């Protein structure tokens, strides 16, 4: 069984990257799809856990979309303190922990 962080998770469908705020502890993982259509100006994060705000991170405006799980530099996130990582093989993915 792979180790899963208690406050981060990945979405159950396809490869995905979980973005968690690194400057404060949040029990709820904010999950973004690993891919998205071109020419999109707004990413809508979704909470994997059934928790009320402030667990949910507000909308993040970016100039373009990119593959989060890739080696390419992430555009448009200067000034935002984020930590990204991929959790493969979690048995109970996105299980509510509140």
Swiss-Prot record:
The modification N-acetylalanine is found at residue 2. InterPro entries: Keratin_matx. Sequence repeats lie at residues 3-7, 8-12, 47-51, 55-59. Residues 3-59 are annotated as: 4 X 5 AA repeats of C-C-X(3). GO terms for molecular function: structural molecule activity. Signal peptide: none annotated. It holds the Pfam family Keratin_matx. GO terms for cellular component: cytosol; keratin filament. It comes from the Eukaryota. Keywords: Acetylation, Keratin, Repeat. Interacts with hair keratins. Belongs to the KRTAP type 3 family. In the hair cortex, hair keratin intermediate filaments are embedded in an interfilamentous matrix, consisting of hair keratin-associated proteins (KRTAP), which are essential for the formation of a rigid and resistant hair shaft through their extensive disulfide bond cross-linking with abundant cysteine residues of hair keratins. The matrix proteins include the high-sulfur and high-glycine-tyrosine keratins. PANTHER family: KERATIN ASSOCIATED PROTEIN 3-3-RELATED, KERATIN-ASSOCIATED PROTEIN 3-1. This is Keratin-associated protein 3-1. It comes from Bos taurus. The gene is KRTAP3-1.
């Amino acid at each position: 069984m792979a180790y899963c962080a208690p406050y981060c998770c990945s979405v159950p469908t396809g490869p995905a990257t979980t973005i968690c705020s690194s400057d404060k502890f949040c029990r709820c993982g904010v999950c973004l799809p690993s891919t998205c259509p071109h020419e999109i100006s707004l990413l809508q994060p979704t909470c994997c856990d059934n928790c009320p705000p402030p667990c949910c991170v507000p909308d993040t405006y970016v100039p373009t979309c990119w593959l989060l799980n890739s080696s390419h530099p992430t555009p448009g996130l200067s000034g935002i303190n984020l930590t990204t990582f991929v959790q493969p093989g979690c048995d109970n993915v996105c299980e509510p922990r509140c």
